[in-house]
Amino acid sequence: MRLNTLSPAAGAKSAAKRVGRGIGSGLGKTAGRGHKGQKSRSGGGVRVGFEGGQMPLKIRLPKFGFTSRRALVSAEVRISELAKVNGDVIDLNALKDANLVTRNIQFAKIVLSGTIERPVTVKGLKVTKGARAAIEAAGGKIEE
């Protein structure tokens, strides 16, 4: 076997269908588009969601909900990620310096996921009940 003798398995490749190339091809004349109508024309077609003038489903259904603007500037931090923070005091700036949250984040909450080995002091961050218990069990404390 040599590189110049390699070829795809039989039946693995099929030639592209050439449309509009005579009656004998099976896809001549109308080229599989049928007769007349918007979809048969060059550049013809309708936008996504268009239902031929009938009121579209997207508009027939009621609006609901909204996008919370606070969610755009809030983040959750796992307790296992706190090991990446240098120093014993963890606040929002320390999380940003450790690249655990992005620069535009204004609120952060520490959640229980994983374990924490060293004692740390958490300042000015929200902490869930489970995370609070884990931090205090490791010898750390939470300051509001």
UniProtKB/Swiss-Prot annotation:
Matches recorded under Pfam families: Ribosomal_L27A
Biased composition range(s): Gly residues: 21-31
Region (Disordered) residue spans: 1-49
GO cellular component annotations of the record: cytosolic large ribosomal subunit
Entry's Gene Ontology BP terms: translation
SUPFAM superfamilies for the chain: Ribosomal proteins L15p and L18e
InterPro entries xrefs: Ribosomal_uL15, Ribosomal_uL15/eL18, Ribosomal_uL15/eL18_sf, Ribosomal_uL15_bac-type, Ribosomal_uL15_CS
Coiled coil: none
Main function: Binds to the 23S rRNA.
Protein name from the UniProt record: Large ribosomal subunit protein uL15
Species, as recorded: Shewanella piezotolerans (strain WP3 / JCM 13877)
Lineage of the species this protein comes from: Bacteria, Pseudomonadati, Pseudomonadota, Gammaproteobacteria, Alteromonadales
Gene (name only): rplO
